[in-house]
């Protein structure tokens, strides 16, 4: 069964809009787990635009399932990861001007610095995933530099429609199959929602899906537990019928 990691960054986005204490992403994470989330994901950005260091520290103490820390491969973030020891680290590209992560890592161009970062994190006993585009060259390079996992970027699939979306789906299927053949645990995420998730969840061998915005957006209307439960049910249906 494909696991569901729920990203609670957008809870923190609402809080930081007023620089106040609520809503609390820690409380949101607890409710997400009650709704069936298999893990919690947060992205601690260099500019601290949403998740704060305090959130990461408390989540590490209270989350009983997988805590996935998304981060850039900077010295500051590596040191934080080594100190907090999340259950896994996902290295992502990061630009100050972007609203959200816009694409996968340029693994080939950054392979030397990524290899060094991966080694430091893995030496502390923390598995490392790389957020990459559905390209075989990036998958091969991820394997070569020591990644334990990859997360296939589904943003282009999520943003497209019709024949273009079907083409993107085939790219993702090929990437997942190739990644698994190389021995990498393989996840997917970015832009997935209640209308497009089933085709991705049905891909054979996929380990997990990491979803944030669509779940939090629905949670505003129906509550976090129900929003997570509805997404979890869609994933289960897709896996059963695959």
From Swiss-Prot:
UniProt keywords (A-Z) are: Cytoplasm, Pyridoxine biosynthesis, Transferase
SUPFAM superfamilies found in the cross-reference section: Pyridoxine 5'-phosphate synthase
Q: Which GO terms describe its cellular component?
A: cytosol
Annotated site (Transition state stabilizer), which positions? 151
Named from the GO MF annotations, one term is:
pyridoxine 5'-phosphate synthase activity
Q: Which InterPro entries match?
A: Aldolase_TIM (IPR013785), PyrdxlP_synth_PdxJ (IPR004569), Pyridoxine-5'_phos_synth (IPR036130)
Q: Which pathway does it take part in?
A: Cofactor biosynthesis; pyridoxine 5'-phosphate biosynthesis; pyridoxine 5'-phosphate from D-erythrose 4-phosphate: step 5/5
Q: GO BP, one example?
A: pyridoxine biosynthetic process
Catalytic site: 43 (proton acceptor), 70 (proton acceptor), 190 (proton donor)
Which cell locations does it reside in? Cytoplasm
- Top-level taxon of origin: Bacteria
Tell me the enzyme class: transferase
> Where on this chain does 3-amino-2-oxopropyl phosphate bind?
7, 18, 191, 212-213
In short, the EC number is 2.6.99.2
Reaction(s) catalyzed by this protein? 3-amino-2-oxopropyl phosphate + 1-deoxy-D-xylulose 5-phosphate = pyridoxine 5'-phosphate + phosphate + 2 H2O + H(+)
Which residues are involved in binding 1-deoxy-D-xylulose 5-phosphate? 9-10, 45, 50, 100
Name the Pfam families for this protein.
PdxJ
Q: Which HAMAP family match?
A: PdxJ
User: What functional role does this protein have?
Assistant: Catalyzes the complicated ring closure reaction between the two acyclic compounds 1-deoxy-D-xylulose-5-phosphate (DXP) and 3-amino-2-oxopropyl phosphate (1-amino-acetone-3-phosphate or AAP) to form pyridoxine 5'-phosphate (PNP) and inorganic phosphate.
Q: Which family does it belong to?
A: Belongs to the PNP synthase family.
Q: How does it assemble?
A: Homooctamer; tetramer of dimers.
Q: What is the protein's given name? A: Pyridoxine 5'-phosphate synthase
Recite the lineage of the species. Bacteria, Pseudomonadati, Nitrospirota, Thermodesulfovibrionia, Thermodesulfovibrionales
The gene that this protein is the product of is pdxJ
